[in-house]
Amino acid sequence: MTNQQAPQTSETVAVVWLKRDLRLRDHEPLVRAAASGYPVLLLYIIEPILLGDPHYSARHWQFIRQSIEDINTQLAPFETQVQVIFDEATKALQRLSQWLTIQAVYSHQEIGLANTYDRDRQIRQWCHNQHIAWHESATGAVIRGLTHRRQWSKHWERVYRHQCYDVALNTIK
């Protein structure tokens, strides 16, 4: 937006930030957002820090595109879709917050890359500054920042014995 004031926010939403888990079944953040009672906005951010990352190939980006198309096909009967933004994550959320009131952000906890860990720390700070709750769900049985494995096997058992987190798609407003 250049020289244009953002409109007053008119709708409060729960944002589900889709990162690597591009599915609608067994998706804890989606279930939690739907249970919040607020309309759910599904968001995928194409981040510049990932475009040049050697962990992401053309096939990876093709998979992401196809997965989002598949999700949108599943959501079409409910007149909603994944919103895709190309930007840094904090800037993308800031742009959304100019148009909508973000009640909370729901996502999976991303693991494995230093650049996404640093990005998540920035997001945590941004959410804190904006008084927006960020609810991260564990990815599998990995515990981010674990310095020992004393409780790991108990945690693994609990995670893998838990029932699927499924949401009725018609509850995503």
What function would you assign to each model-found segment?
Residues 2-173:
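Active-site "lid/cap" and pocket-lining segments within catalytic core domains
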